[in-house]
């Protein structure tokens, strides 16, 4: 409750400070709430943020509102250049989270003088917003990666090449948006350095960088995702360690593999081999009809893999296959940029 231990003029100044910062905090919360609702579809966070906003609204007393017009504010309308430089949803989330946190800190400090209840409320919400900010940023990053995954039909897997970085850049220039890196020979230090270099290339071209199998390398290189085989670390543990802003894909060869992958919450599935392939010599080809049966009810992205070449993509397309993963076709190409462009064109062609 309010008390009258301070002088009237000082009270007015303090009320004005609290009023301005309650407005700032509530406005910033509204921005976060709307992004959680319309941008991310996260009902849990919408309810949580709305509750914070309503609590502050309930404590926005009339005495605070009345103070705003009683002392002239010569700094009204001041802006900063950084406010004009926000170009992404992440920047908007970060700036408005900071706006809320800073406003709540001011409220917490000044309301201690006469309204301990409001000070406590501001402190509790401020600490909650630190976590909300991190979660919203993670969800937003995942949303972008998920969008790339859904909208792009060519998934390129690397092979060991002396000029690997050159090949990767050529296919990225061509328009490839998903790269999975497989490790073969070399030390872990070599693998990490190579992963970081490929990650930087993918970032430059707004493409996803996915690491095959190695969670440690994926974490250390800040990869966008990881692809797991049936004998790798389980998805639940991987998700816990890797985080919810990252893409996790699973290899599948049968209905049980697919069912388990869906139950565990994977983001995409690689299904195959479709045809005979030198990269999976011990795997019997599934064939077109078998894969069509396996995938008829799949509602997440899936990529056909195994023995896929530029000369059989049109055949796959005619059979309803939309997304494919390639290895040797581009890794062994004499002109990876041109071949990647041709394959992308073929995949975009409506049969």
Curated annotation (Swiss-Prot):
Its gene?
thiE
Cofactor info, note text: Binds 1 Mg(2+) ion per subunit.
Segments of this protein annotated with the region Thiamine-phosphate synthase: 129-351
Q: Give the E.C. number(s).
A: 2.5.1.3
Residues noted as binding 4-amino-2-methyl-5-(diphosphooxymethyl)pyrimidine in the record, renumbered to the chain:
180-184, 212, 251, 280
Which co-factor is required? Mg(2+)
Q: Which family does it belong to?
A: Belongs to the thiamine-phosphate synthase family.
- What Gene3D superfamilies does its record include? Aldolase class I
Pathway annotation: Cofactor biosynthesis; thiamine diphosphate biosynthesis; thiamine phosphate from 4-amino-2-methyl-5-diphosphomethylpyrimidine and 4-methyl-5-(2-phosphoethyl)-thiazole: step 1/1
Give the protein's recorded name. Answer: Thiamine-phosphate synthase
UniProt keywords, alphabetically: Magnesium, Metal-binding, Thiamine biosynthesis, Transferase
Q: Where is this region: Unknown?
A: 1-128
Any one GO MF annotation of this record: thiamine-phosphate diphosphorylase activity
* Keyword Transferase among UniProt keywords: yes
What PANTHER family does the annotation carry?
THIAMINE BIOSYNTHETIC BIFUNCTIONAL ENZYME, THIAMINE-PHOSPHATE PYROPHOSPHORYLASE
**A single BP term in Gene Ontology:** thiamine diphosphate biosynthetic process
Q: Name one GO cellular component term.
A: cytoplasm
Where Mg(2+) is bound, by residue?
A: 213, 232
Q: What's the stated role of this polypeptide?
A: Condenses 4-methyl-5-(beta-hydroxyethyl)thiazole monophosphate (THZ-P) and 2-methyl-4-amino-5-hydroxymethyl pyrimidine pyrophosphate (HMP-PP) to form thiamine monophosphate (TMP).
Binding residue positions for 2-[(2R,5Z)-2-carboxy-4-methylthiazol-5(2H)-ylidene]ethyl phosphate: 277-279, 307
């Amino acid at each position: 409750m309010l008390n009258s231990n301070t002088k009237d003029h000082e009270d007015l100044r303090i009320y004005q400070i609290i009023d301005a910062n309650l407005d700032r905090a509530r406005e910033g919360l509204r921005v976060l709430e709307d992004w959680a609702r319309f941008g991310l579809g996260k009902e849990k966070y919408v309810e949580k943020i709305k509750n914070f906003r309503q609590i502050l609204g309930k404590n926005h007393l009339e005495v605070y509102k009345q103070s705003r017009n009683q002392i002239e504010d010569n700094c009204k309308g001041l802006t900063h250049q950084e406010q004009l430089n926000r170009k992404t949803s992440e920047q908007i989330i970060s700036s408005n989270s900071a706006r809320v946190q800073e406003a709540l800190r001011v409220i917490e400090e000044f309301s201690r003088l006469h309204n301990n209840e409001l000070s406590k409320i501001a402190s509790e919400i401020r600490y909650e917003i630190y976590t909300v900010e991190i979660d919203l940023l993670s969800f937003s990053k995942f949303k972008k990666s998920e969008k790339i995954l859904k909208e792009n039909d060519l998934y390129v897997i690397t092979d060991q090449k002396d000029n690997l970085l050159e090949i990767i850049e050529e296919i990225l220039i061509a328009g490839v948006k998903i790269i999975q890196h497989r490790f073969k020979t070399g030390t872990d230090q070599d693998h990490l350095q190579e992963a970081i270099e490929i990650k930087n290339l993918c970032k430059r071209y707004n493409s996803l960088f996915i690491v095959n199998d190695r969670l440690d390398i994926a974490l250390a290189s800040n990869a966008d995702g990881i692809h797991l085989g049936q004998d790798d670390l389980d998805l639940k543990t991987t998700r816990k360690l890797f985080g919810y802003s990252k893409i996790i894909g699973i290899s599948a060869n049968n209905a049980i593999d697919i069912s388990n992958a869906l139950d565990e919450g994977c983001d995409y599935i690689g299904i195959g081999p479709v045809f005979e392939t030198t990269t999976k010599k011990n795997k019997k080809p599934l064939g077109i009809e078998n894969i069509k049966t396996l995938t008829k009810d799949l509602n997440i992205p899936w990529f056909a893999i195994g023995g896929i070449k530029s000369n059989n993509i049109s055949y796959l397309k005619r059979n309803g296959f939309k997304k494919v993963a390639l290895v040797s076709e581009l890794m062994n190409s004499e002109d990876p940029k041109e071949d990647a462009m041709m394959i992308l064109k073929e995949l975009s062609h409506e049969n």
